[in-house]
Amino acid sequence: AYTWVEQTVYVNDIPSNELERWFELESERFRRPILRLFHTELETVFEEYNISQDKDFRKTLKAMQETLTPSHPYGTQTTLGRGEDLKNPSQTNIYNFFDQYYVPNNIGVVMAGDFDPEAVVALAERYFGNWKSKPIPPFKFEKQPALSQRIQRDVYGNEAPWIEMGWRFSGAASLEAEM
């Protein structure tokens, strides 16, 4: 599994003869998550967070995001979260997040490999078909402050030097995005 910006991705490599068991397990996991190993997994994420703090790529990305999007989640936290949140997590908040965002109208299943597509669709219907959609809260954030001049941030690290440049534009649907 991994997270990045606006996605959480779970990757599984399943033999064709175990597809039904996979659908059964995944439907249970997504519909009724039980966080038994929560603290063990949290330690792994926190260690990944700590390691990432020393990586030049992460440091430069964080500096660029903070500069370009200071009042947007991209600029206020990393994809791994904030250290203080990882130190003091709330299982209630995590369950609430799952309940709000892990809903069928906000999830996609992509499969490739040696299987019968019609049989897979039937399995998806069997195990996920009665899962009810819910409204997803709109993604809201504060308007970004205007950038009226070039901003340079210097980030120092242990790797070979490089230059990273970024521009803010009107959005993915704008003409500027095609440049």
Predicted regions: what is each one?
Residues 12-42, 175-177:
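M16/insulysin-pitrilysin zinc metalloprotease superfamily fold
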Residues 37-42, 55-64, 115, 122:
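Non-catalytic accessory/assembly modules
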Residues 1-18, 51-106, 130-174:
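Non-catalytic beta-strand/loop surface segments
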Residues 11, 23, 27, 46, ...:
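Short, well-ordered alpha-helical packing segments
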Residues 5-6, 24-26, 44, 106, ...:
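A general alpha-helix detector
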Residues 31-36, 116-118, 128-134:
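Bacterial peptidoglycan biogenesis and beta-lactam-recognition machinery
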Residues 42-49:
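Short amphipathic alpha-helical coiled-coil/interface segments
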Residues 42, 91-127:
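Non-catalytic, conformational "gating/processing" segments within enzyme and secreted inhibitor domains
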